[in-house]
Amino acid sequence: MASWLLSTLLFLSPSLVSAKSAADYYVHSLPGAPEGPLLKMHAGHIEVDPQNNGNLFFWHYQNRHIANRQRTVIWLNGGPGCSSMDGALMEVGPYRLKDNETLTYNEGSWDEFANLLFVDQPVGTGFSYVNTDSYLHELDEMSAQFIVFLEEWFRLFPEYERDDIYIAGESYAGQHIPYIAKAIQERNKNVQGKTIASWNLKGLLIGNGWISPNEQYMSYLPYAYEEGLIKEGSRTAKELEVLQSVCKSRLETGKNKVHLNDCEKVMNALLDKTVEDNKCLNMYDIRLRDTTDACGMNWPTDLEDVKPYLQREDVVKALNINPEKKSGWVECSGAVSSAFNPQKSPPSVQLLPGLLESGLQILLFSGDKDLICNHVGTEQLINNMKWNGGTGFETSPGVWAPRHDWSFEGEPAGIYQYARNLTYVLIYNASHMVPYDLPRQSRDMLDRFMNVDIASIGGSPADSRIDGEKLPQTSVGGHPNSTAAEEQEKERIKETEWKAYAKSGEAVLLVVIIGVLVWGFFIWRSRRRHQGYRGVWHKDMSGSSVLERFHNKRTGGADVEAGDFDEAELDDLHSPDLEREHYAVGEDSDEDDISRQHSQQASRAGGSHNLS
């Protein structure tokens, strides 16, 4: 009877069988990882569309340190249809590939003071999958599925549900991110007064974003003139201006379109005009050139290592990839990009005013060497946008917020500008993928935006200044961006270690002296009683001599007791290389996490160009 009832329940409730716990997503090892303790991470698929076999893949890293608050940063790449593994392994993640087999640490990783969550979306992107007849078409469809993903992710990892949440990304993610933010705010309104927790969405970061097609399409020629790519007034320029006038007319009649073919022709023609010796301009980094059939699609060069690494069988297994997905990882999915062509969803620029007026902080940043999502277009969309009682960066009618010079480790890094919850950062000498070129500067920008305060944990600050002023929150903590600060930390650790060794040696020497004196006293008494005494170093005693015991302590034969050390000095020791396994005060070990999760489970029974 009992077995029949159990079988019936399992049949009626397949979720009892299929429900996963966090332990099922734990990454036990990562091929090619640097020596030492592995960073704490989870990865795998979460189902978001059961009817169409829709699953989103995520890769999550726990923060290495906690400053003044718990934070989670969600990172999305663009496309549409380009994998966020670009961000994980080439931009803001803790690892970079030295070759297709070896990982190295990224000095500017964003996981220093925030949990990092990379998501391949929409379905069909990267390691995510769905039935081939069920790719998404609209931005509101995408955001709805992302909410389903987050609901399940927070069920699996409830310890992060109260974190300050930031959503970051680049390029076509400039469409995704505002839509997801709006969906989160609507979800929070719907759960008010219920026992369900609201999500503490604090800010958005969009780099070289495809946000406003009107301004971005119309920025191609002005940017090309500004950078000397095309000579203004030339025959070539006039030919391109004809195409741009057609684009402008289409924009006026199709204001709610995210993508327009007539405007894409401007970029295609511009790239064709730059061909020399079978090489054309790299549209993602104008300092570089590429083959005429690619014009930047072969960039970054790290892709040569990322693709074979993510297609390795041992890596796929380590990341808990569904073995039924046999297509293998590709950076950008043409099928997803072709299907995702919003006709009903207005461009995300129309959502920004409402998000800013709700109190949400938004940061738009632009690498100055990107053509396809260049800073001229971003600056123009800001100038034209109205929010919070003003237009653009107005502080009062006719008065604009000043631009502040940003320097990093003594070198000009860019400019900052802020008004009414919106921050703009122009970053010098950076491409379409700012963190790829300048990881440490990008981390400094993130820490400023999140108001990271490391005063409670110490560490040496990065030399980062706004108009020459260094603010406390620009420090980068125990895993410093500054090379000089890192060397100082190593010297401090070495000095503290030597002090500890010296103290332990002094303590042992004192024990030896006391032992010798006591032994001598007994020998003296023995000689007085027995005249046949043979001496201290008799061969029968050689195996347990005090000197050998002392030698054993020096060579690790036995540990010096804790009382021999100054515990305060030892507690102060910290190095990212030596203590990378420590993440938070009072945190349980990975094994404890897994066993607890098993216990809890038992108790509960884009277009023609990729905007990557």
UniProtKB/Swiss-Prot annotation:
Please indicate if the UniProt record lists Zinc-finger as a keyword.
no
Active-site residue list:
S171, D370, H432
EC numbers listed for it are 3.4.16.6
- Where does the record say carbohydrate is attached? N100, N421, N429, N481
* InterPro entries from the UniProt entry: AB_hydrolase_fold, Peptidase_S10, Ser_caboxypep_his_AS, Ser_caboxypep_ser_AS
Q: Which family does it belong to?
A: Belongs to the peptidase S10 family.
UniProt-recorded name of the protein: Pheromone-processing carboxypeptidase kex1
Organism listed in the record: Aspergillus niger (strain ATCC MYA-4892 / CBS 513.88 / FGSC A1513)
